[in-house]
Amino acid sequence: MDLDMITRQFPYADLQLNFHEVGQRSAFPTIILIHGTGGNTDKHFSYIFPMLGIHQRVLSIDLHTPDKADLKVTDFSQQVEALIQYAVAEDETITVVGYSLGAVIAAQVAASLKQRIARLILLAGWAKTSSVQQLRTTIWQQLFTEQSAALPHFVNYCLYSDDYLSTRSEQQVLDLARFVKPSQDAAKQRELNYRIDITATLPDISAETLIVACREDRMVPVAQAKLLFASISNSRYIEISSGHALYIEAPAEVVQLVNQFSQHPQQYPANQKIQPSMP
């Protein structure tokens, strides 16, 4: 990541949680990044984070997974709210960007803070876990419990698009397994993923919202993004050519979309499906 990045801490309950900062406050909104399941700033935003910092102030949280049963989305969204309270001035405009589970958390933050959040960008997010997603999570949990050598390959099959994988040899695809490092925190987050349902909170979102779907996503099907689009007023929808790992397959496009919508939302009319500028 960018050498000018600053890592700091903020108080939450009786903890000190890490967040990262890059860029300077400007005429554009300050961006808050929220990573996905089993991730952190480095894993999910290593390219996106510093590139966004060229034009505006960007904060990225490393979420803490509480050691408790029956996690709730608010166990994470309240961490983001605490970061905003600690690190963002009252007169700073805010754009919240969430990826995957981070998109679910971002939606919860926007619903809770209402007008405090000016813009909301949901990357590969969902509102209510489908039976297909539950099946995939069940397989993941079983492979994790068994410490199966097949788990990293299953994760990569779900994570990447056919186009991304098919450009690599069989051995190169198998070698991707070395980047998958499942953890107990990820397992607890996936248990939460199994029962996500934020549909009742979506009408409370007042932020101008951009919903980004990944056309070849095996983890979060496009239908989930369409449900978000139908449920959030003042939203617009775009599909990009990528699997779930858009931070690897389409990072430049993500940076472009986030910059354009955060800085110039008037270019994206509400309640419209937007055509991507990249093929």
Predicted regions located by residue number:
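Catalytic histidine-centered segment of alpha/beta-hydrolase-like enzymes
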Residues: 242-255
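Conserved HGGG/HGGXW glycine-rich cap/lid loop of the alpha/beta-hydrolase fold
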Residues: 11-67
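Acidic catalytic loop of the alpha/beta-hydrolase fold
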Residues: 215-220, 245
